[in-house]
Swiss-Prot record:
Name of encoding gene: ZNF584
Pfam families found in the cross-reference section: KRAB, zf-C2H2, zf-C2H2_4
Family: Belongs to the krueppel C2H2-type zinc-finger protein family.
KRAB domain segment(s): 17-88
Matching InterPro entries: KRAB, KRAB_dom_sf, Znf_C2H2_sf, Znf_C2H2_type
Organism: Homo sapiens
Location of this chain's protein in the cell: Nucleus
Name the record gives this protein: Zinc finger protein 584
């Protein structure tokens, strides 16, 4: 007893978490139920945590799990997995379970004796509500024999934390839970349920009202869903495992890579049902639809002009302020927008990626190429409503319209010019 007490007080023995303590295991059957995205997420989480624990000097030089993870093509399950299950009945009794968990129903199939360590707790056990049999689709009242049959099916999917006895249902959040046992967290939330490393992380108004329930332990940012929190936490690791095969740019999330690759492929899967315009990102389509409903909520206080989008409003204000925040490091020229600087940079690099399919001439931008191609088709789609004259480019039409303004006519008369359309 004295030895145990001494070990508990020894600071060198407290707060350590080994890689194997935060490793999630799957049986072959469970692994087979995961789709490609879920398997990729599992792989990312394991590799990131191996890197994190390694940086603390707490991981083995070569973990069996890490070796298995490097093989992307093989669906695997570690042969040395030895884990114990928790039945739903044990989970309902609360979090104060002692010792190892065991299957309560003796009729459980031997395959159900495999379970997995846990990550994320979900309160899904509501008293008095009927439980639905996930395999047969039947609903059972609490305590019925059919409900006991359901316990057999889910026995292998309920897990228990070996440190505090909490029971969980899912296998993708144990890292979040176990870290609470391994880090010093002196600042406790006023509700008494959570602790943080920094006092600035505590924001009980948002967390306990349900507005945001999942908080990042590094920066205190809160999220409504654990999946969004996991995506955010990759920012702090600095790991960017997803690399673009075309330009070499790396990303910390696979979905970010997919969006980026649409730049190279030209894929624009989101189409506006009103005008047929397509977009590569769904959020851009949502913003675009405001054009059709006539929403213009942003007003410039300098000139009274209205804008549909906040970013367009900000760019417009630079006309009044003269701000040109994007400067070319090569020649010092400044630009209002980042895209303007990017187009200018091609002057220095000589890059002309847009080629005319009719004559082979190349251009720095897609719009320049499209404008050039109109010369081949002799398309004149911009017509003056005053005189009916047609032009190939909208900019030429705008320049022409000045001829019809009273100021321009007065000026031409003063110089003895004859205005003709």
């Amino acid at each position: 007893m004295a030895g145990e007490a001494e070990a508990q007080l020894d600071p060198s023995l407290q707060g350590l978490v080994m890689f194997e303590d935060v490793t999630v295991y799957f049986s072959r059957e469970e692994w087979g139920l995961l789709n490609v995205t879920q398997k990729g997420l599992y792989r990312d989480v394991m590799l990131e945590n191996f890197a994190l624990v390694s940086s603390l000097g707490l991981a083995p030089s070569r973990s069996p799990v890490f070796t298995q993870l490097e093989d992307d093509e093989q669906s695997w399950v570690p042969s040395w997995v030895d884990v114990t299950p928790v039945s739903r009945a044990e989970a309902r009794r609360g979090f104060g379970l002692d010792g190892l968990c065991r299957v309560e129903d003796e009729r459980a199939h031997p395959e159900h004796l495999k379970s997995y360590r846990v990550i994320q707790h979900q309160d899904t056990h509501s008293e008095g509500k009927p439980r639905r049999h996930t395999e047969h689709g039947a609903a059972f009242p609490p305590g019925s024999s059919c409900g006991q049959q359901q316990e057999v099916h889910v026995a292998e999917k309920l897990f228990k934390c070996s440190d505090c006895g909490k029971v969980f249902l899912k296998a993708f959040a144990l890292l979040d839970h176990l870290i609470t046992h391994s880090e010093e967290r002196p600042f406790r939330c006023p509700t008494g349920r959570s602790a943080f490393k920094k006092s600035a992380h505590i924001n009980p108004r948002k967390i306990h009202t349900g507005e945001t329930a999942h908080v990042c332990n590094e920066c205190g940012k809160a999220f409504s869903y654990p999946s969004k929190l996991r995506k955010h936490q990759k920012v702090h690791t600095g790991i960017k495992p997803f690399k673009c095969s075309d330009c070499g740019k790396t990303f910390n999330r696979k979905d970010a890579l997919v969006l980026h690759q649409r730049i190279h492929t030209g894929e624009r899967p989101y189409e506006c049902s009103k005008c047929g315009k397509t977009f590569s990102v769904l959020s851009t389509l949502i913003r675009h639809r405001k054009v059709h409903i006539g929403e213009r909520p942003y007003e410039c206080t300098e000139c009274g002009k209205f804008f549909k989008y906040n970013n367009s409003f900000i760019l417009h204000q630079r006309v009044h302020t003269g701000e040109r925040p994007f400067e070319c490091k090569q020649c010092g020229k400044g630009y209002v927008t980042r895209s303007g600087l990017y187009q200018h940079w091609k002057v220095h690099t000589g890059e002309r990626p847009y080629e005319c399919s009719l004559c082979g001439k190349t251009f720095t931008t897609r719009s320049y190429r499209n404008r050039h191609q109109q010369f081949h088709t002799e398309e004149r789609s911009y017509e003056c409503t005053e005189c009916g004259k047609a032009f190939k480019h909208s900019s030429t039409l705008l320049q022409h319209k000045k001829v019809h303004t009273p100021e321009r006519r007065q000026e031409d008369r003063a110089h003895g010019k004859v205005v003709s359309c």
